[in-house]
Amino acid sequence: MSDFLALAQPGVQKLSPYVPGKPVDELARELGIDPAAIVKLASNENPLGASPKALEAIRAELAELTRYPDGNGFELKRKLAERCAVDAAQVTLGNGSNDILDLVARAYLAPGLNAVFSEHAFAVYPIATQAVGAEGRAVKARAWGHDLEAMLAAIDGQTRVVFVANPNNPTGTWFGADALERFLAQVPAEVLVVLDEAYIEYAEGDELPDGLDYLARHPNLLVSRTFSKAYGLASLRVGYALSSKAVADVLNRVRQPFNVNSLALAAACAALDDHDYLAQSRRLNDSGMAQLEDGFHALGLSWIPSKGNFIAVDLARDAGPVYQALLREGVIVRPVAGYGMPTFLRVSIGLPEENDRFLQALGKVLAHD
């Protein structure tokens, strides 16, 4: 029998499959309990559920499931271009923002080239990089966040892409406008900067720099965003990139046909118009973050301040057994040892009662540790 792993290209041989947050149904089967009794705070999902306007748009689209979607996503691109004050030709749609990251890697990376990203950064950066045979350069973090100066120093003549996230997942750390401006000014023009803003909608006012403000001055900048988080459409898989027309043209040369389905296109268009839902999502996230921080303080735990819809808490011990014990309590969070954070758990912000259930379970587990 052929060794099909050995036949794969070397970069793929070194990869391990991405491990997502544990599904509710899987834990329910393992414990033999009703899925409704389980609290999942593992995947940075919106606890409000989808926007009512998005659900209405999905229902209206169901009669057309026999048809292929608009392969160019004309209406969603138009709405995004209007919202973001760019030309529609600067918008690339993806099957989630993960798809955008993969498109970048396939278009710009190859064996002999490299991509730079931070330690403790999103796992898809190295996966996408190694999958095409390129070298991934993980730069040591500073205070759990991006060390932008060190990342600049890691760039060489074979660097084609730099991945930066603001805020970063799973740490929740962020950098300000001055730091971003200095960084962009020093990145060589032939290196594409991918600014991952998956959680930007949770920022209020000028808490975080808006990547769109830098597009016109930096043609090597691509801003990646998603409808999976604040817009509550994670299962539909729809994300997008905003970039120069030249970069968008390149990405569309490798983009799969019909990569965003009709339901996702319709729901995303409607979600963009549901301003009340987005405002409610922000308010819930702010109050939930405060609730968890207060709970961690009461338990004597430290955490990393976060601008996302999640928070990383330091248990000051191997977090693996605590994670397993929480599962037995019917609570799913995210261990992040694979991100070089073995004493941390990442906890998504949930509804008040979900946050309370988690804190009670955590207190119980720690008391018996």
From Swiss-Prot:
InterPro entries in the cross-refs: Aminotrans_II_pyridoxalP_BS, Aminotransferase_I/II_large, HisP_aminotrans, HistidinolP_aminotransfase, PyrdxlP-dep_Trfase, PyrdxlP-dep_Trfase_major, PyrdxlP-dep_Trfase_small
Pfam family, one: Aminotran_1_2
Pathway: Amino-acid biosynthesis; L-histidine biosynthesis; L-histidine from 5-phospho-alpha-D-ribose 1-diphosphate: step 7/9
GO molecular function: histidinol-phosphate transaminase activity; pyridoxal phosphate binding
Superkingdom per UniProt: Bacteria
Any one Gene Ontology BP term: L-histidine biosynthetic process
Swiss-Prot/TrEMBL catalytic activity: L-histidinol phosphate + 2-oxoglutarate = 3-(imidazol-4-yl)-2-oxopropyl phosphate + L-glutamate
CDD domains (UniProt xref): AAT_like (cd00609)
EC id: 2.6.1.9
Residues modified as N6-(pyridoxal phosphate)lysine: K229
Keyword annotations from UniProtKB, A to Z: Amino-acid biosynthesis, Aminotransferase, Histidine biosynthesis, Pyridoxal phosphate, Transferase
Enzyme class: transferase
UniProt cofactor(s): pyridoxal 5'-phosphate
Family statement: Belongs to the class-II pyridoxal-phosphate-dependent aminotransferase family. Histidinol-phosphate aminotransferase subfamily.
Assembly with partners or alone: Homodimer.
Protein name (database record): Histidinol-phosphate aminotransferase 2
Organism of origin: Pseudomonas aeruginosa (strain ATCC 15692 / DSM 22644 / CIP 104116 / JCM 14847 / LMG 12228 / 1C / PRS 101 / PAO1)
Source taxonomy: Bacteria, Pseudomonadati, Pseudomonadota, Gammaproteobacteria, Pseudomonadales
Gene designation per UniProt: hisC2
